[in-house]
Amino acid sequence: MTKNKGLIIILSSPSGAGKSSLAKALLEIDHNLRLSISATTRKPRPNEQDGVNYYFKTKVEFEKLVKQNQFLEHAKIYDNYYGTPKKHVENLLNQGLDVLFDIDWQGARSIKQNAVNAVSIFILPPNLEVLEQRLRNRAADNEEAIQLRMASAQAEISHSNEYDHIITNDDFNDTIQQIHTIILQERKKRN
């Protein structure tokens, strides 16, 4: 009996809506999930490790990988490049593991156009005031960066209708359960 290929599960949201925390929690409760690790040209945040959180690349290195067609998708966001390396994802899917993507709407659109086994979930903040407070509380960005993220949040949210599912993250544990239920249902459909 051949093993089924894994699913691609896409989580997207405006910056600060909780998708990275949700992804981490999902990985802890579902042992068939693996996180897709993106490459980026942005500087590492405190406690981020190369090859664990991201593959940190220079702009020249990143552009070389683009020319070599090494990404499933790539985009420029907030003056930095982000992309999903193909090889690692393909290896996981071929093992029957599900791959969780923590990416923006541009990457989600690109993957959905090219993958038949993808399910997309958009995470909304309860409102924009809560979103701004979350960005300020994480203290990772200066005021200019926070304002840039808030300005782009509306544009990001405007693409939520392109997703298979939309969930408002007003209760973290409830949101985890909603996402996990979607994943379990998608597995049943495909098996």
Swiss-Prot record:
Keyword Cell division: no
SUPFAM superfamilies per UniProt: P-loop containing nucleoside triphosphate hydrolases
Source domain of life: Bacteria
Catalytic activity from the UniProt record: GMP + ATP = GDP + ADP
Protein residues bound to ATP: S13, P14, S15, G16, A17, G18, K19, S20
GO CC annotations on file: cytosol
SS bond list: none
Subcellular location, record wording: Cytoplasm
Enzyme class: transferase
CDD domains membership: GMPK
UniProt keyword list: ATP-binding, Cytoplasm, Kinase, Nucleotide-binding, Transferase
Principal location listed in the UniProt entry: cytoplasm
Any one GO molecular-function label of the UniProt entry: ATP binding
Coiled coil regions, renumbered to chain: none
Role: Essential for recycling GMP and indirectly, cGMP.
Protein's recorded name: Guanylate kinase
Organism: Rickettsia bellii (strain RML369-C)
Lineage per the UniProt record: Bacteria, Pseudomonadati, Pseudomonadota, Alphaproteobacteria, Rickettsiales
